[in-house]
Amino acid sequence: MSAMKTDGQAFSKELTVLNKQGIHARPAARFVKTANQFAADIFVEKDGEKINGKSIIGLMMLAAGPGSKFTVHASGTDAQKALLEIEALVKRKFDEE
């Protein structure tokens, strides 16, 4: 996991998928549920593709398997809090294991 990068009220963090099955339906739903708790625009970028972090389908389309690296970008009032909570969720393996 890399250090959080800031740009005004925008924050970015590279994370690694740690759970055994990657980001499938349940982890994507948990990610979106967490993201939706905050007043922030959240985008996820993997292999040059950038999707809305509040979209379950978008997250699943990234095909982020175990060990995959992806970057979360957050901007807005709660951007830093959102990014910290998302990082915690990923580190907890999406509460699956």
Which role fits each region the language model picked out?
Residues 2, 16, 55, 75-77:
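Intrinsic disorder
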Residues 2-5, 33, 81-85:
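Long, contiguous binding/interaction regions
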Residues 16-57, 61-65:
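Compact, glycine-rich, soluble single-domain proteins
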Residues 7-9, 63-64:
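Solvent-exposed alpha-helices and their adjacent loops that cap or buttress functional pockets
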Residues 3-5, 11, 56:
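N-terminal loops that bind phosphate or other acidic moieties
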Residues 8-14, 69-71:
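Intrinsic-disorder/low-complexity, polar/charged segments enriched in Ser/Thr/Lys/Arg/Asp/Glu/Gln
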Residues 65-97:
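C-terminal structural segments of small proteins and small subunits
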